[in-house]
Structures are given as C-alpha cells and as structure tokens.
A protein has these predicted regions:
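Bacterial signal peptide processing site
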Residues: 8-12
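Sec-dependent bacterial lipoprotein signal peptides
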Residues: 1-6
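Surface-exposed, gly/pro-biased binding rims or lids
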Residues: 144-184
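Short, exposed beta-strand-loop hairpins at the edges of beta-sheets
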Residues: 186-188
C-alpha cells in the first residue's frame, strides 16, 4: 500500500470572478418518490447502518462509558424503481447479498445465539436465499469479498426464516433490529 500526499505552503491570490453561477439542470434525474416506510426513516444515501441496541450512536454520545453494541448491520440500500422484486430483481433459490453495491456486513461485538446456534463475536457478510415460503439467511466469514460468489465452506451459520406477508409495499430495502423478549430480531 503506497500513500502519497502533497502539501503546498504557497499563497495563491485569487481574483473574484463576476460570473453568474447557475445550478445544474436536474430535471432529467430520477427524484426519490415520497414513500411510507413504517420500519425506519428512509435515508436515500446508498449506505445505511442499523444497530442493536437501536439508536446506539445516540446512546454512546450521551454516555461514552457504555459497552459496545451487540450488533451492527452495514448495507447499501437498494430500491425497486418500479421493478418487480421477483423475476425482475431477485430469483427464487439464488443467493442475494441483501443489498446493493457491496456485500452487506453484520458485526457481532459479543457471542450471540441465533435459533439455538452460537455465533462468535466477529464480522460476517450476510446474504440470503429466497424461497417461495421462507428465506435462508447465511452468515459467512469470507469478508471483503463483494458478496457475488459465496464460499459455503466459510459459513458461520444458516438460518431458515419463514416469510411473513403484509400489505405494505416498500420502495427502499431496509434492515432494522427490534428488541424482543428474548433479545432482538432483525427485519428485512
């Protein structure tokens, strides 16, 4: 790894320019539609994070001496853009990296138990395989791999999650944690 930096201490005199500055025309760019998302406010930036406990960064700012969070999800937020989710974006029985641009990552700051299986503290990519009646969610230790070719030999755990349907159509993919009586659940 080679890092190169340049600095200059010369003073440069800049003459003011009396030119009219106009904003670029963005009328031909896609503008986000107003959508309702009952799970989390939508940040239209391509990257998002979810913590457990929820709002951990705010809690830490109020008290710097608290322990690390239990988990953090980092993902790029894809959206449908009027496409059909299945047969348009995803296919049943094929892996999806649960996000756009990069492999989504989950970091556990301590050992957690998911469906009775202990997962050691660490950083994992998280991806899923959709089936008509359930999803297989996979935690994999092959980090920094962009998530396009999964190496099953590095799976830390596979979990079958039944599908729950609702009547809400969401434009933006969202992953959030929610506190439960037994710990936390993550919703996609």
């Amino acid at each position: 790894l080679v890092l190169v930096g340049f600095a200059c201490e010369q003073k440069v005199q800049v003459e003011p320019v009396a030119e009219k500055v106009t904003s670029p025309d963005i009328s031909n760019k896609q503008q986000p539609e107003i959508t309702i998302n009952p799970f989390s406010p939508v940040d239209v930036s391509p990257m998002d994070m979810s913590y457990f406990p929820v709002d951990y960064p705010k809690i830490k700012m109020a008290n710097a001496n608290i322990p690390p969070p239990v988990a953090r999800l980092i993902y790029s937020r894809p959206h449908l853009q009027r496409r059909a989710l299945f047969n348009g974006v995803l296919k049943y029985e094929e892996p999806w990296r649960l996000g756009a641009n990069e492999a989504s990552e989950i970091n556990f700051y301590k050992t957690v138990t998911i469906q009775g299986k202990k997962i050691p503290a660490g950083r994992y990519i998280i991806y899923g395989i959709p089936h008509p009646d359930k999803w297989t969610i996979i935690l994999n230790s092959n980090i920094d791999s962009w998530g396009l070719k999964q190496d099953a030999s590095k799976d830390a755990g596979r979990f079958e999650i039944p599908i729950t349907n609702n009547d809400i159509s969401l434009e933006y993919f969202t992953m959030v944690f929610e506190k439960t009586d037994t710990g936390a659940a993550s919703f996609f």
